[in-house]
Amino acid sequence: MFNFKRKRKIDVTGSTVKTLDWTNVSLSQYIELQDLVLENEDELEQEDIMLQEIQILYKVDPLSLDLQTFKKYVESLKFMKKEIPKMKIKDKYNLGGNIYYLHKKLEQFKVGQYIDYQRIMQTKKGIETYPEFLALFITTEEDGTYGDGYDVAQVITDIRKYMSIADATSIAAFFLKSCKLYTALSILSSMWRTRKVIKDRKTRKQLRKKTMHLINLVLNGE
C-alpha cells in the first residue's frame, strides 16, 4: 500500500518528461528532497520516496501516469546519484526574471551584513541557511549595497525558488571559505595589535596560543 500524498497545482498527465540534472534543480526543490528523506526515512518505503521525488522535481501526479511514461520518469531520476557539480561563479544571476549582482569582495562587508552573517550561522544549520546566507552577497544593482533600496526578503525568496542547487552550493562554498579566512585574518591582525602593548612575555605567549586556537576553531571547527 503506497503512503503517497498528492500535492496541489501539479500537471496530472505529465506526458512530456523534461531532462533534469543538478544545474536545473532549484534550491527549494533540493531542500524539499532532503527533508523528504530525513523526515520520512523510517516511515516511507523506497517506492513512496521515488513517487514523491517525481512529484517534487517534475510537478506531476505520478499515480496518474501511464506505465510507459512513468518508466521514463523513473529513468530520469538517475542523475540524483551523481555529485552536485561545481559551477563557475558569475557576476550576475537571472532569478525568475530578476537580475541580481554578486559581490565577492569581503573587505566591502558592512556591519549589518556581518551581524546578519553571525545570526544565520548561529541559528541555522546546513542547506537551509543558503537562501539567507547567499542574500548577504547579492544586490539588485551592480554597485548596490546590502539592504539599501531593495527588499532583502524578496532576494531570499528568489534565491530559494529560482537558483539551482549547483549554483547555490558553489557560491556558498566560495563565501564560507572566504568568510572563514577573512575572520581568521581579522583575529590575527587584532592579536598583533594587542601584542604591541603587552610587555610581559608570558602574557604575550598565552595570547598567541589562545589566538591560534581560536583561528583553528574558525577554519577547521576543531
Predicted regions: what they are:
Residues M1-E222:
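Charged interaction scaffolds used for protein-protein
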